[in-house]
Amino acid sequence: SHDHYDHLDYSTIKLLKDKVSKFLAPHGIGNHLKKWGVKSNQIVELNWNESFSTENIEFHCLPSRHFSGRGPLNRNSTLWSSWAIKSPPLKIYFSGDSGYGKHLKDIGDKHGPFDISLIDCGQYNNAWKHSHMFPSEAVLAAQDLNTKVFLPIHWGVFTLAMHSWDEPARESIKYAEKVGLRYYIPEIGEIISEENFNLPINHWWERY
C-alpha cells in the first residue's frame, strides 16, 4: 500500500521475492523492490484507478488519504494507495493506511458492494487524524463501501499512538454493533473463510 517501514519491510521482501510471481504496488515502490533483489518482470506499478488482471483476479489500485517516504529527504516521493481485489463472486477491499474521506464513498459507489473490507482503525490521534481512521470512522468507511463484513486492521502490532494496544478492536466492535454491521477479528495466524463469519466472535485479545 505504501513505503512506510511498517508496511514495506526489507527482511520480509527478501523472504518473499523468490516465492511469488508478481509484486503489485503503487507507483514508485518498484525502486525499493529492485534494490532489494526483486526482478523487474516481477513488479507491477500502478497509479490510482489503474488495474491489473491475472487469470480470474482483478487488482484495482485506488486512492487513500495518507503519505509516503522512508526518511526526511524522500517524503511523498512515492504513491500510497488502497486496493480492491475482485475474483468473482468475491470482492475484497484493503484500505492500507488512510484517514477518513469522501474517497471511500466514491470507491464504494464504483467498485462495491464488498464482501469483506479490511479497514485501518488503529494508531489514531487528533494530531494526525487525516492519516489514520478512528474506530468510529472505520465503521463509517465500511458503510460507505457498502461492505458485508468489516475486518478492523492496523492495530495490535506497532505502537504509533498513545491508545492501548487493544482499544481499536474494542472500539470498532462497539461502533459496529451500534449500526448492526457484521464484523470479524481473526486471531493472529488464523486462516479465515466465509464460514468463519457465522461463528461467535472470539474476543481473543482479552486473554492478553
Model-derived features with residue positions:
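Cap/insert and terminal regions of metallo-dependent hydrolase folds
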Residues: K22, G28-N31, K91, G99-I188
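Active-site metal-binding motif and surrounding structural segment of the metallo-beta-lactamase
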Residues: S1-A25, G112-L118
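Helix-loop-beta element that forms the nucleotide-linked donor phosphate-binding surface
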Residues: L33-N47
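Metal-dependent catalytic neighborhoods of phosphoester/phosphodiester hydrolases
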Residues: D9-D18, L160-R170, E195-N196
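Core dinuclear metal-dependent hydrolase active-site scaffold
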Residues: S11, L46-G112, I188-Y208
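Alpha-helix capping/helix-boundary segments
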Residues: Y5, I29-G30, E50
